[in-house]
Amino acid sequence: MMDLFKFFSKDNGTSKKVAKERLKLVLVHDRTNCSPRFLEMLKEDIIKVISDYVEIDEVGLEIKLTTTKRDFDEQSVPALVANIPIKKMKERSR
């Protein structure tokens, strides 16, 4: 009977997962001493540099701080992850 309630519940554990991810994000930001404003400035700078080479979809652009494990010692460290949709390559002459 209890499984039937779980089946029809709206949550299905997703709010727990979302809360866990938000907590991880808060901890990463806290440990790296990275404010939301700093992350936004970093995003703007990345857009400026990459835009010299490619046309990007700024609406779909996502940059976030997360954690990853280093290969050599498996220690968790902060990581900057960027998902940058490219519309097209720009021709450059230098």
Swiss-Prot record:
InterPro entries for this protein: MinE, MinE_sf
Keywords: Cell cycle, Cell division
One annotated GO biological process: cell division
Family: Belongs to the MinE family.
Primary role: Prevents the cell division inhibition by proteins MinC and MinD at internal division sites while permitting inhibition at polar sites. This ensures cell division at the proper site by restricting the formation of a division septum at the midpoint of the long axis of the cell.
Annotated protein name in UniProt: Cell division topological specificity factor
Organism the protein comes from: Alkaliphilus metalliredigens (strain QYMF)
